Structure formats: structure tokens, C-alpha cells
Amino acid sequence: MKKELLIFGSNGALGKGVTKVLLQKDFDKIYLFDFDLTNDKISMNKTVNIQVKDLTKEENVITALSQIKPDKDIYYFLFSTIGGFWGGETIWETKYEDWNRMINLNLNTSFLLAKHFSWLVKASAGGSICFTAAFTAENPEGMKGAYGASKGALIHLVKTLAIEGQKINLSANAISPYIIDTPANRSWTPDADFSRWIKPEEIGEIVYSLFSNFSYISGNVITLKDRFKS
């Protein structure tokens, strides 16, 4: 049975690290989806680069996934880094458009990917999907209400999909990082202890472990906070 992988957000800070790891694994083909592939387009025999448009629009998700054809001899896997952060204001200070922006970026895009990837898996041998949630989704923090709510709803989506996915041989999980070691995060918190942060490449290994055992690992949210002090 063949194994094919879809990575959405492959060109972002998290996506690049995860992609670097998963390119070395035993997938027969890897589809790399992102909004901008001009600078870091990966060309390997088993990779396909696909540029996408606004994924909050259902027609764009359908167009992106229509390039992969159902096949009863293929297991399909999807990892998504799609989302965004916004914070710094209380609930009463939060503008409705900012609230909606977080819901659109973090929940609605994930719903659309889950919905249409499920149809692909249903017509194939089976598969697994893994989303990127956030630590604050299950551990509320002030000034992150819209972000936390959107990621919390994403976790509910994942757990529901894990239940329903049993009917079509689809498992669903999420990783839930606190702070990922990226250049942007380092610049925002220059005095932090970077040695305790999880790296994108380490997340790639975790995602691969979930996919390697997809037939019985489902409905889980893998919390990734700080590593032990050395």
C-alpha cells in the first residue's frame, strides 16, 4: 500500500522544519501547499508544489485538494500549520472583525480541510489528519481570548472527526505547542530561555509518529510545552 502526504503551510516557519523531516520519511509522494512558493520551492522526485489561495473560501480548498485523486491502494495523510495569532486585548476591547479573523484563520480553514480531505480518504484506503492547535486552547490566558477560543474549537473539531472518522478509516489528532522555536518568536521574547522551546523539526518527528501509528492513535491532543532544563 502506498502512502502519500499533504502538508499545508509548508513554507512557513513551522512548515519548513516539519517538511524537512518528513521529506526523509517513507512517503511515496508529498504534496506541498502554500500561498507563496517562489523562494523556497522544493524540487524532488516525490514532491509536488501547489500554490493555494485564501483557504477560508471553500472553493479554494476544493481546488487545492482536487489535484489529488482518490485511490483504494493509497493511504493519505495531511498535516496543517494553517492559522494565525492575534492577541493583546481583553474581551471587551476585542473588535468583532478581529474575533472573526481568528475564527476564520484557525477554525474555518481547518473545518474546510477536514471536510474535503475526509471525502478523499473515504474514497481511498484510509488515512490520518493532524492539525496545529495551541497550548492556550486548553489553558486559557488573558489577552488571548479570540485566539484561544478559535484553537479550542479546533480541538473539538479534531475530537469529533476522530469519532466520525472510524467509519471511513480516518484518524485525527492535533499538536498543541506553547512556544515553537522560530526566528519570529525569538525576536518577540529575546530574554527567554530558547533551549526549552520545541523545534519545528521535533514537531515533524511527532507528526510522523502519529502517522506511523494512525490506525489506532486518534482523538489525541499532544501538548508541547517546555522541555526539561538540562
Where are these regions (language model features)?
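Substrate-binding pocket helix/loop in short-chain dehydrogenase/reductase
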Residues: 75, 89-91, 98-103
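N-terminal Rossmann NAD(P)H-binding glycine-rich loop of SDR-like oxidoreductase domains
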Residues: 11, 15-19
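Catalytic loop of short-chain dehydrogenase/reductase
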Residues: 83, 122, 128-153, 158-167, ...
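A short, exposed helix-loop element centered on a Lys and neighboring polar residues
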Residues: 114-115, 159
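C-terminal helical subdomain
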Residues: 174, 182, 192-230
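Active-site "substrate specificity/gating" loop of NAD(P)-dependent dehydrogenases
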Residues: 94, 140-144, 185
